[in-house]
């Protein structure tokens, strides 16, 4: 098909941007697929195939920057706080919409304390994001924004029932413990009853922040549908009401930076504890991402030229 030929041409151009040094840097965190033709190794049928075809046609109409090498065009977080909102789009500064909200307080705390933790732990930034993950609509305080559960990555834990008035005191105590390599997960859970393990094997976040860039509002739904279809084939798909362990949650997030490299996809794997942040992701390559990176017990990375940043964190 025409879009596959266009994809192969663009992929060839992008692949040439990744130097041998860049491949070596990536391989320090994850094994790279041996095959140079990963896109043709896995495909979809039925509705999934239709979503890919329609998605590629929509993507082809968008202006995406393909000339700049992607590696190290973004920064890996030390800690990534993800706040559920049940939304797929937000105001321009998503975490700052409401000064009374949990995400506002977390964002302010991150800005205030980034320098303090600059030489502690691995990664470079303290990040707060809002997501389409579901919030508890039966809790009036959650609906007011003054209370929420917060997913903390790459630690795969939930901080439950966090109130906005308690954010500063809570994070002042919790973050140093998270960044302390001598404190185990078991000890943390024992001493903090409001902290629980996230039982997913992976989280996949797709930027859908249309208010910041309309391209993300176009690309995100297509990608999610293909991810969902492929994960269903392996029994790994989990919707918002499915809490079975060892599944994969696909969610939308707010602006992650680098919209010119749309579509941006952040993949957190629990085992090994690794973040892979990809740019210029299109529907055609999603099946290979699922089959190589998410499904296997020993993941391998297809399309290393798509990596914006990557980090293998300490397992705990």
UniProtKB/Swiss-Prot annotation:
InterPro entries, alphabetized: Aim32/Apd1-like, Thioredoxin-like_sf
Gene Ontology, cellular component aspect: cytoplasm; cytosol; nucleus
Compartments where found: Cytoplasm; Nucleus
Entries under Pfam families matching the protein: Suc_Fer-like (PF06999)
Keywords (A to Z) from UniProt: Cytoplasm, Nucleus
Biological function: Required for normal localization of actin patches. Involved in tolerance to sodium ions and hydrogen peroxide.
Protein name (database record): Actin patches distal protein 1
Note: Present with 2000 molecules/cell in log phase SD medium.
Lineage top rank: taxon: Eukaryota
Major location (coarse): cytoplasm
Family of the protein in this entry: Belongs to the APD1 family.
Description of what induces expression: Expression is controlled by the transcription factor YRR1.
Species: Saccharomyces cerevisiae (strain ATCC 204508 / S288c)
Keyword Lyase listed: no
Phylogenetic classification of the source organism: Eukaryota, Fungi, Dikarya, Ascomycota, Saccharomycotina
Keyword Secreted: no
């Amino acid at each position: 098909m025409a879009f596959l030929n266009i994809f192969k041409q663009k992929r060839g151009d992008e692949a040439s941007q990744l130097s041998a040094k860049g491949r070596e840097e990536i391989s320090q965190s994850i094994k790279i697929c041996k095959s140079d033709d990963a896109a043709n190794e896995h495909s979809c049928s039925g509705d999934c195939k239709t979503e890919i075809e329609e998605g590629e046609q929509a993507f082809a109409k968008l202006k995406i920057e393909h000339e700049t090498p992607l590696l190290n065009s973004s920064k890996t977080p030390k800690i990534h706080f993800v706040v559920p909102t049940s939304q797929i789009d937000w105001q321009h500064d998503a975490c700052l919409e409401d000064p009374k909200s949990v995400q506002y307080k977390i964002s302010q705390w991150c800005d205030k304390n980034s320098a303090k933790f600059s030489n502690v732990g691995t990664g470079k930034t303290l990040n707060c994001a809002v997501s389409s993950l579901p919030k508890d609509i039966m809790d009036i305080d959650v609906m007011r924004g003054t209370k929420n559960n917060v997913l903390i990555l790459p630690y795969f834990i939930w901080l439950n029932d966090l109130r906005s008035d308690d954010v500063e005191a809570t994070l002042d105590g919790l973050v140093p413990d998270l960044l302390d390599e001598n404190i185990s997960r078991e000890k943390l859970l024992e001493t903090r009853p409001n902290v629980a393990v996230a039982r997913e094997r992976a989280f996949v976040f797709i930027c859908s922040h249309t208010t910041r860039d309309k391209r993300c509002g176009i690309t995100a739904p297509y990608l999610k549908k293909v991810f969902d279809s492929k994960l269903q084939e392996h029994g790994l798909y989990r919707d918002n009401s499915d809490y079975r362990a060892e599944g994969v949650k696909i969610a939308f997030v707010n602006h992650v930076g680098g919209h010119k490299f749309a579509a941006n996809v952040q993949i957190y794997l629990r085992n090994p504890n690794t973040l892979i942040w990809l740019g210029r992701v299109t529907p055609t390559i999603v099946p290979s991402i699922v089959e190589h990176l998410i499904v296997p017990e020993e993941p391998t990375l297809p399309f290393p030229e798509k990596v914006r940043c990557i980090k293998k964190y300490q397992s705990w």
